[in-house]
Swiss-Prot record:
Disulfide bonds join C52-C67, C59-C71, C66-C80. It is found in: Secreted. Residues 1-22 form the signal peptide. One of its GO terms (cellular component) is extracellular region. This is Conotoxin Lt6.5. The presence of a 'disulfide through disulfide knot' structurally defines this protein as a knottin. Expressed by the venom duct. It comes from Conus litteratus. Keywords: Disulfide bond, Knottin, Secreted, Signal, Toxin. Belongs to the conotoxin O1 superfamily. Residues 23-50 form a propeptide. Its main location: secreted.
Length: 89
């Protein structure tokens, strides 16, 4: 009887250790995956906004680097802006 109980208790102990370790590693792995996902997302958005010039800033007409609107050439200077047209009624 004692010889049968010892292996059963040992197996239960090892299974409990394995389950605890699996839960711990899953949480730790999930955190690192979430962290790397945030890094990828941040680099994606930084690439989208890189080189974007705000309204009124100097721009290159051939590069299309304005955040909003387009690159307008006004009095020998190129600036980002939105061209509004006035319509008379």
């Amino acid at each position: 009887m004692k010889l049968t109980c010892v292996p059963i208790v040992a197996m239960l102990f090892l299974m409990a250790c394995q389950l605890i370790t699996a839960d711990y590693s899953r949480e730790k792995h999930g955190y690192s995956a979430e962290k790397s996902s945030d890094k990828i997302q941040d680099s994606f958005y930084s690439k989208l906004t890189k080189g974007c010039t705000d309204e009124g800033g100097d721009c290159d007409p051939g590069n299309h680097n304005c955040c909003r609107g387009s690159c307008l050439v006004l009095q020998h200077k190129a600036v980002c802006g939105i061209l509004y047209t006035m319509v008379s009624r």
